[in-house]
Amino acid sequence: MQKIHSFIALSLSSVFMAAASVAHAQNIAAGKEKATALCAACHGADGVTVIDPSYPKLAGQYPDYLARALQDYQSGARKNAIMMGFAATLTKEDIANVSAYYASLPSPLKVKK
């Protein structure tokens, strides 16, 4: 009986993990679409800006950091007129998707040895 319960629990967790992976892939695709439309002009198509070195490099950043930054622009906790305007147009889902997309990209930042 214990083996059956363990098997069922393992099977269900596998199903949920597979579903989460599929949803994650969709989030990244949606995030790329939104980022291309709103963010790429300043932050670069690959999340590494070539326009102005003071613009943050977004590629490879932690998704929770990116999401928090966008939420802070929406709430006014972070101040930048351009970013506040763009962030105001984003839904919670958009923020999660864009954050997942940029986090999925390779980081250009390297530690010097």
What are these regions (language model features)?
Residues 1-11:
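Bacterial N-terminal signal peptides that target proteins for export
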Residues 15, 75-78, 88-113:
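C-terminal capping alpha-helices of c-type cytochrome domains
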Residues 18-20:
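N-terminal signal peptide c-region/cleavage motif recognized by signal peptidases
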Residues 24-47, 61, 111-113:
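Sequence/structural segment immediately N-terminal to covalent heme-attachment motifs in c-type
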Residues 32, 48-75, 84-88:
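Gly/Gly-Pro-rich "capping" loops immediately C-terminal to redox-active cysteine motifs
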Residues 36-44, 68-71, 84, 96-100:
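C-type cytochrome heme c attachment motif
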